[in-house]
Amino acid sequence: MFRASSFHTIDPKGRIIVPARFRDDIRAGGADGVMVSILDKALYAYTFNEWQAIEKKILSAKSEPMRRFKRFFLGNACECLCDKQGRILIPPSIRAYAGLEKEIVLVGMLDHFEIWSREQWDRENNLMEEELEKKEVREAIASLGL
């Protein structure tokens, strides 16, 4: 399971060092690499096993909005293998979508991890701070026992 967050840099070639704790989970998920796609101005990285499960779920989605989502999410997906230094290469097209230039944040989300630009991550955290002021959000969190 992918947990916690860590701050990194992306090199000029688009390579990201994957933390050792994430690499262990990646290998346990079927291979030494991840499938990466785009969503919410970030990149979502899944183990190959998890990605296969997602594809099965998405396959049955037939509505017009879901067909568009499939094109967007699956059409922008890239296989990113870990090199010997534990890095993955992020292709320029999806790097641009997420605004990844120098400072980045890797965020563990249990079944996947997300890759954010530091700037976008700070914005996302500020939005969450605002959301936490809403009673319905606090109640939803409390319903989880937190």
From Swiss-Prot:
It comes from Desulforapulum autotrophicum (strain ATCC 43914 / DSM 3382 / VKM B-1955 / HRM2). The gene is mraZ. Its main location: cytoplasm. It comes from the Bacteria. Keywords: Cytoplasm, DNA-binding, Repeat, Transcription, Transcription regulation. Residues 5-50, 77-120 form the SpoVT-AbrB domain. Pfam families: MraZ (PF02381). GO terms for biological process: negative regulation of DNA-templated transcription initiation. InterPro entries: MraZ, MraZ_C, MraZ_dom, MraZ_N, MraZ_sf, SpoVT-AbrB_dom, SpoVT-AbrB_sf. GO terms for cellular component: cytoplasm; nucleoid. This is Transcriptional regulator MraZ. It is found in: Cytoplasm, Nucleoid. Belongs to the MraZ family. Forms oligomers.
